[in-house]
Amino acid sequence: EMCIRDSLGIKYDPSHSFVHGGDKGAYLKEGMEWGDKFVYCHVKGVIQYGDSHEPSEWKNRELMVRHPELKDELMGDFAADRRYYDNPPAGIDSINWRAFFAVLYQHDYDGYLAIEPHSMTWQGEKGEKGVKYTIKYIRDLML
């Protein structure tokens, strides 16, 4: 008899292991542990300068929801300067996509791959070129 837990899947984004304060290689560990549950993966590059500031934003999230007028003050430097990380195209970022795909193949992943361009730097024509670069780069990793 199948239980609900067996029928649930995970939408996974390896870049979140970086910007949410995780160990830089956490996405590989998470993939090894949970990859058999992945049903949808985001393909979004990330580069990060120093430690993540994002966990402090989440601490204040409930307060910001109740008092949106205080959002800028509560977020402090995080709101004013998000330059401690960016989301360049996959393949010119910090994620080891070859190793991540090896983990996906280990689990016989056959789910979706979604390119997710959120960069503040890669906008307009540069953003379009970045998406094309990501498509080419990821295609080369597909068997």
What are these regions (language model features)?
Residues 5-8, 106-109, 143:
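Short helix-capping segments at alpha-helix termini
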Residues 37-39, 86, 97, 108-115:
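A short pocket-lining beta-strand/turn micro-motif at the edge of beta-sheets
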Residues 125-143:
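C-terminal helical cap(s) of enzyme catalytic domains, especially alpha/beta-barrels
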Residues 30, 103, 137-141:
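A generic secondary-structure signal
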